[in-house]
């Protein structure tokens, strides 16, 4: 049995340089680094994310918690209280995710900017990527609807039957039944995502409302209600995911409750809702926030073929 890491010394040194550059970038901008708990009593209600369950003892009594899938919930409690820009670099966990771009445990950079619009945050992201890449970087902006144009379909106007026909025409034989967003996710991941950001880093904007999660909603240029969020793609890899942050506790609770109803229909575990976050939500200042995969950023910068080379020891070898 080999004890050696999956990452070479040179790759580890490159990773260390990226982490140093990120911290220096935020120090220069006056953004405060914070640390929040990895273990939480509440879980992620998102139906596409599996939380890692943790069993422990609290004051001598057995308890069940979850390793966080993102520091978002706890960071927003700090944001609501302190009302200052904050960032965090930490390990996060998502169960049942393993592949060339996935590891169950990975490193996330997350930051929140009070009184920043999504455009402001996109510009700061561009500056950070330029620093990490050590060269000026420009972004291309592409709407979610326009990303489907090469397939000859419109995600908001066309029917599920049109989506199904498109999938079959491209030899994708999976049945998402009557799940409209499921069909769109299938087509996007198989036929659109692999080519995004191949020539220039691409911001995909105006996602369907069904993908809003913790983002606000607005009407796009065609009048469709969409999520105020964007994702950054480089070389066909999703690098970052940003929201114009929802600051409405009642709406957030309704979304979490709806998620759990979907989880029940799908036979997934019902997740405890983070009531601390709900209580803090109304006090969050107008802001935008973003999560960035550090391991994936290292992959695209150093042209690594697998996330294995961006992480010293992967979960299956830990």
Residue ranges and their predicted role:
Residues 122-132:
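Short amphipathic C-terminal alpha-helix that caps PH/PH-like domains
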Residues 1-2, 6, 18-22, 224-250:
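Polybasic, low-complexity association/targeting segments
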Residues 250-318:
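Active-site pocket scaffolds in enzymes
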Residues 72-74, 92-94, 113-116, 209-211, ...:
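Short, glycine-/Ser/Thr-/acidic-enriched flexible segments
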Residues 1-120, 172-177, 193:
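Class II aminoacyl-tRNA synthetase-like tRNA-binding/catalytic domains
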Residues 204, 242, 293:
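Hydrophobic, well-ordered secondary-structure elements that form the walls
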Residues 131-235, 258-284:
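Metal-assisted phosphate- and nucleotidyl-transfer catalytic regions
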Residues 45-48, 231-268:
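Active-site-proximal helix-loop elements at catalytic-domain edges
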